[in-house]
């Protein structure tokens, strides 16, 4: 589907597979847990979804597969085309930028980058990088796009029990933070 202005279509998927929709104000939660996202008029928040599992190794391959929750099998999914394969076959450039523990084979056939590589400051400390690192260099990348493109930003997300390490102090709103 061509864009009206002739520019390439750019789709940015932000994947944070351990986040609970019930705790996002975007989905009706009564506390303002994501006010910056709410201010962006271009956000599409998918509301009628559920996870195939509670671990990245299952939930990530499932969300990019054609299989539903009931019929999903990790081994079967490895040998099927997933959403990213189909986008690539349709002529899209497809990139995966990761701030978690990898794509669990979802991005094996496309371009991928480990955002944590190089331990960039001020985003990284020890074994962790805040998800803001996924935005590092993104604006420059967006300016150089000449073809339809899908970019997946895989967040570390809200894995416990060290929740307080998932965000910089400037975003600390709810206490106690168990740090």
Q: What does each of the following model-derived ranges do?
A:
Residues 1-13, 18-178:
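Active-site-proximal alpha/beta segments of enzymes that process anionic O-linked groups
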């Amino acid at each position: 589907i061509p864009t009206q202005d002739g520019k390439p279509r750019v789709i940015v998927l932000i994947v944070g597979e351990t986040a609970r929709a019930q705790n996002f104000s975007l989905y009706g939660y009564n506390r303002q847990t994501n006010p910056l996202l709410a201010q962006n008029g271009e956000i599409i928040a998918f509301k009628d979804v559920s996870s195939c599992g509670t671990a990245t190794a299952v939930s990530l391959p499932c969300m990019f597969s054609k299989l539903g929750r009931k019929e999903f099998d990790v081994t079967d999914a490895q040998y099927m085309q997933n959403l990213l394969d189909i986008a690539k076959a349709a002529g899209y450039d497809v990139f995966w930028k990761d701030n978690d523990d990898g794509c669990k084979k979802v991005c094996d056939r496309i371009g991928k980058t480990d955002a944590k590589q190089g331990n960039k400051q001020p985003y990284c400390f020890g074994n962790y990088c805040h998800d803001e690192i996924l935005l590092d260099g993104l604006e420059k990348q967006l300016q150089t796009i000449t073809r339809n493109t899908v970019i997946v930003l895989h967040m570390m997300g809200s894995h416990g029990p060290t929740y307080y390490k998932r965000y910089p102090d400037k975003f600390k709103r709810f206490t106690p933070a168990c740090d």
